[in-house]
Amino acid sequence: MAVIPTQPSAVDLEILEQSVRIVQAAKCEGLIVLNACPARAPEIAEARGYAASLGLTVAAIGERRPFARAFAEGAGIAERERGPASDEVAALWSEVATQLGIAPRTKRLVNVTA
């Protein structure tokens, strides 16, 4: 399985197509993760649509202060606090586990575009 992290910026999305072609040529499962997505930014929907048009599942992780606080403490977000940030990471892991055929312990991503 290949997880392709990218930010929802024009520069990152321009390179994304090459990464997706490599994953598809390898004939393996793939997941595009739009990372550090600003809240309520209209460009996110556009970035999601473009990423989805490339043929892989798309997930999004928001740009949230709890991630920075957890990093500064040397902790994972699940160790740091409960809330949208930890829910997004748990849902992301669930999607990865599902694609790998591992029984996930949490719900799948709600905001996935296939």
Q: What is the predicted role of each segment?
A:
Residues 86-114:
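Charged phosphate-binding loop/patch that engages nucleotide di/tri-phosphates or the phosphate backbone
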Residues 1-9:
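Inter-motif core of Ras-like GTPase G domains
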Residues 2, 29-31, 57-58:
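Hydrophobic anchor at the start of a short beta-strand
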Residues 38, 48-76, 95:
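Beta-strand-loop-alpha "switch" segments that mediate conformational coupling across diverse proteins
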Residues 10-13, 40-42, 86:
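Loop/helix-junction capping segments adjacent to catalytic residues or to phosphate/diphosphate-binding pockets
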Residues 13-39, 47-51:
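Conserved C-terminal guanine-recognition region of P-loop GTPase G domains, centered on the G4
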Residues 71-91:
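C-terminal boundary of histidine-terminating zinc-finger modules
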